Structures are given as C-alpha cells and as structure tokens.
Amino acid sequence: MARKKLMRFKWNEEVHNLFQPEKENYKAYKGKWHEYFKNDNPVILEVGCGRAEYTTGLAALFPENNYIGLDIKGARLWKGSSLSIETGLTNTAFIRTKLQNLEEFFEPGEVKGIWITFPDPKPRESEAKLRLSGLRFMNIYRRLMPAGGKVFFKTDNRVLFDHTLEVLTDQTLKIKDLVFTHDLYQSPLLAEHYGIQTTYEKTYLNQGVQINYLKFEFLPL
C-alpha cells in the first residue's frame, strides 16, 4: 500500500494537469485559465471533488466546457488526474488546495458553474464556517461567478441540505430559479446527472438513503 501511495504522489508531482503547492505554476493561471486550456470555453468547478467523478464525467459528455476539480487531498485528486490522462480528456484540471482559498486561483467572473457533491456536513456549530454550502462559501462563489452562474448541490445529509436552503434565503446572495428535491431518484431532475454517481452516492443508495439535490442561478449584483 505504501508503494502505491508513493507512486501516486510521484504522479501528482510530475503530471501537467494537477496543480499543487510544490509546483512553480501552482497559481499561475488565475484569470488565465483560457491559456491553460487553449480555448475560451466556460470554466466549471467541482469543489471538494474527491475522486472527481463529476469533473471527469461531465468533461467527457461536454467537451465544449472546461472542468476543474478541487480538493485538499492529493491521493483523491490522483484518481481524476490519472483517469483524464488515460481517457484523453484535455478539458480537465485539478487543484490541491483548501477551498477557502478559491479566490487565489480564479478572478471574479471567471467561473461559470460550481458543483458541490457530497461534502463533509461539518455538523458541529464550531465548524459551520467550513460548510461548503454555507453562507461564507456561497459568498465566495458569488464573487467568482457572473450573473447567470449556476450552483449545483448534492448531499445525503438532510440537516445540511435544509441548512443550505435556509442560507439561500439570504437576500444579499441574489439568486433565482431555485429548484430542489429531497429524493433525487424519484425526481425528473435526475436526468440532469447523466448517470454520474460518486462513490459516496453509490454507498448511500445501497443503504436506501435518499439523495437531496438543488440548483440555482445568481442574479446580477
């Protein structure tokens, strides 16, 4: 196991599509992701991407978009990075970072969409500011996206989901077209997921847990 982990760390250090602190170009593409991708296509993020099932799955389905997966764990990012290389995906990239540092990698208006897929619910009140669907992060997403930018959120955790719905009532966020379901797999909204499932999602479904999902769009500030 240790040998496999070392091989993955070495991959992360050498591969071109994964950005991490040890690399000189770690933050080089802020405001210039079109230079990395060599096109002006929309940039869509998967925050807390884990194994990056949505980053790679959506990238394969929609080559007209660029997808970037972000996570703090390099071992997780290895999966998306290596799969992208193996399958010839040129419209993906991966960044190892704490997600509160998003604005160090993107200029305001540079991001057109954000997927939040099964984040850690951070149930303690002392951890509230670390919830990826909390007000602190929603304000970060708001600054990164222009009017029309879309956020998509999936979780098995009903408490976190209901908290997120409450967060979205904050008038300073200025959102529209909020749509949600507490049971995605019994909803017409399921078609928007194109059969993509995360590892966590498969586990929860096997346990009979319902999946919550919402999406909305930002209005002009």
UniProtKB/Swiss-Prot annotation:
S-adenosyl-L-methionine binds at E46, D71, D120. GO terms for cellular component: tRNA methyltransferase complex. GO terms for molecular function: tRNA (guanine(46)-N7)-methyltransferase activity. It holds the Pfam family Methyltransf_4. InterPro entries: SAM-dependent_MTases_sf, tRNA_(Gua-N-7)_MeTrfase_Trmb, tRNA_methyltr_TrmB_bact. Keywords: Methyltransferase, S-adenosyl-L-methionine, Transferase, tRNA processing. It catalyses: guanosine(46) in tRNA + S-adenosyl-L-methionine = N(7)-methylguanosine(46) in tRNA + S-adenosyl-L-homocysteine. It is an enzyme of class 2 (transferase). Its EC number is 2.1.1.33. Substrate binds at D156. It comes from the Bacteria. The keyword Ribosomal protein does not apply. The active site is at D120. Pathway: tRNA modification; N(7)-methylguanine-tRNA biosynthesis. Belongs to the class I-like SAM-binding methyltransferase superfamily. TrmB family. HAMAP family: tRNA_methyltr_TrmB. Catalyzes the formation of N(7)-methylguanine at position 46 (m7G46) in tRNA. This is tRNA (guanine-N(7)-)-methyltransferase. It comes from Cytophaga hutchinsonii (strain ATCC 33406 / DSM 1761 / CIP 103989 / NBRC 15051 / NCIMB 9469 / D465). The gene is trmB.
